[in-house]
Amino acid sequence: MAEYLASIFGTEKDKVNCSFYFKIGVCRHGDRCSRLHNKPTFSQTIVLLNLYRNPQNTAQTADGSHCHVSDVEVQEHYDSFFEEVFTELQEKYGEIEEMNVCDNLGDHLVGNVYVKFRREEDGERAVAELSNRWFNGQAVHGELSPVTDFRESCCRQYEMGECTRGGFCNFMHLRPISQNLQRQLYGRGPRRRSPPRFHTGHHPRERNHRCSPDHWHGRF
């Protein structure tokens, strides 16, 4: 029996433990889930919840109407966000093996940033220290994640352009970075530093919002 239970742990056949939490590190039911969310006490991977804000979903003019943002502008904004977070975390906490950002729309996945460090102790230290940080006008909420193999977490249909669930799919829709940035970060090439958007200890002062790149970046 013990061998059987071990073999189905974290799968759909497991009626005790939540398979979605095991694979993705979050669950749309949250604390109301009828199955257990076994939070790891150590892991190489951390998740920074709802950290990325897609300007196509959030950009507004002063009167509150939606502001059109082109695909090119969105990619530039995303690459800048990705580079800043990747560089900040790697320089402060240790070598990063992989970083992924969800482009889903569901509350439990939207803007989640998953960072897999080479060493478990680096992930633990990052979670402890980031809990007192602010980024882009919001408090950073980080936790250790059970996700280690993102192939099990990603929506295969989305990768083939065939997902019928759209942004509310419960598997990860990962937003890619540009090829140049991919080579720059993972090829360990030279990086340019941008002004930091991480802040420590207190809520940054609000500014008037405009429909502009500075608004999307949340510079304070």
Swiss-Prot record:
Composition-biased stretches (Basic and acidic residues): 209-220
Chain intervals for the UniProt region annotation (Disordered): 185-220
Positions bearing N-acetylalanine: 2
GO cellular component terms, A-Z: cytoplasm; nuclear speck; nucleoplasm; spliceosomal complex; U2AF complex
Superkingdom, taxonomy of origin: Eukaryota
Keywords recorded for this protein, A-Z: Acetylation, Cytoplasm, Metal-binding, mRNA processing, mRNA splicing, Nucleus, Repeat, RNA-binding, Spliceosome, Zinc, Zinc-finger
Gene3D superfamilies for this protein: 3.30.70.330
Cellular compartment(s): Nucleus; Nucleus speckle; Cytoplasm
The keyword Hydrolase appears for this protein: no
GO BP: any one term: mRNA splicing, via spliceosome
Annotated Basic residues bias: 189-208
Domain RRM stretches: 65-147
An example Gene Ontology molecular-function term: pre-mRNA 3'-splice site binding
Broad class of where this protein is predominantly found: nucleus
The UniProt record lists the keyword Repeat: yes
Organ and tissue specificity: Isoform 2 is widely expressed. Isoform 3 is highly expressed in heart, brain and lung, lower expressed in thymus and much lower expressed in peripheral blood leukocytes.
Zinc finger motifs (C3H1-type), residue ranges: 12-40, 149-176
PROSITE patterns (UniProt xref): RRM, ZF_C3H1
Record function comment: RNA-binding protein that function as a pre-mRNA splicing factor. Plays a critical role in both constitutive and enhancer-dependent splicing by mediating protein-protein interactions and protein-RNA interactions required for accurate 3'-splice site selection. Acts by enhancing the binding of U2AF2 to weak pyrimidine tracts. Also participates in the regulation of alternative pre-mRNA splicing. Activates exon 5 skipping of PTPRC during T-cell activation; an event reversed by GFI1. Binds to RNA at the AG dinucleotide at the 3'-splice site. Shows a preference for AGC or AGA.
Subunit structure: Interacts with GFI1, U2AF2 and C1QBP.
Family, per entry: Belongs to the splicing factor SR family.
UniProt protein name: Splicing factor U2AF 26 kDa subunit
